[in-house]
Amino acid sequence: MVENGSRVVMEARDIRSALERLAREIVEQPVDPNGLALVGIHTGGVFLAKRLETLISKKLKHSIPVGTLDITLYRDDWTRLHTQPVVRATNLPFPMDDRDVVLVDDVLYTGRTIRAALDALIDYGRPKRVQVAALVDRGHRELPICGQFIGIELKTRSDEQVNVLLKEKDGVDRVVIEQAAQARKA
């Protein structure tokens, strides 16, 4: 569906279905469910990690820990984005050592966000394994990073922006592709 020059590629039901599949894939992997933890990257990844935890906990019949990770000061571009970085809280209420961690983000793009998240995560301990879950993989990698759990792969152009709208912050669940200049004005 096209609205105001933007293309809607996922609606609420599509996002729900993708998250249910991701939860199933995470649970089906060979891992000790007691050593599994989800870490959401601020901001969209935090909401998605919490949703995944709800789905995974139902499947495992017990809760798994969820943390939040701020990567602002680990980014290689923060000085280009803001003169004063906005730093959010990192909350990892579990030991990181020997843990199977799934880093959760809304969009996997160049790989730079995941690289920054790995740097930040390692400052908190030595996980046994780190995997990546993203609702959208839009390609265009600049670093050798890949996602293990992907909701949807989209073919995009570099002049487009993928916006993941989530009901927790935007009041609606939707994934939209827009022209980059259009997205900046919004």
UniProtKB/Swiss-Prot annotation:
Stretches assigned to coiled coil: none
Pfam families: Pribosyltran
A GO molecular-function descriptor: uracil phosphoribosyltransferase activity
InterPro entries assigned to the protein according to its UniProt record, in alphabetical order: PRibTrfase_dom, PRTase-like, PyrR, PyrR_bifunctional
Enzyme Commission code: 2.4.2.9
Record GO biological process: regulation of DNA-templated transcription
Residue span of motif PRPP-binding: 101-113
EC category name: transferase
Reactions catalysed, as given in the entry: UMP + diphosphate = 5-phospho-alpha-D-ribose 1-diphosphate + uracil
Record key words, sorted: Glycosyltransferase, Transcription, Transcription regulation, Transferase
Family assignment from sequence similarity: Belongs to the purine/pyrimidine phosphoribosyltransferase family. PyrR subfamily.
Job of this protein: Regulates the transcription of the pyrimidine nucleotide (pyr) operon in response to exogenous pyrimidines.
Record's protein name: Bifunctional protein PyrR
Gene this chain is encoded by: pyrR
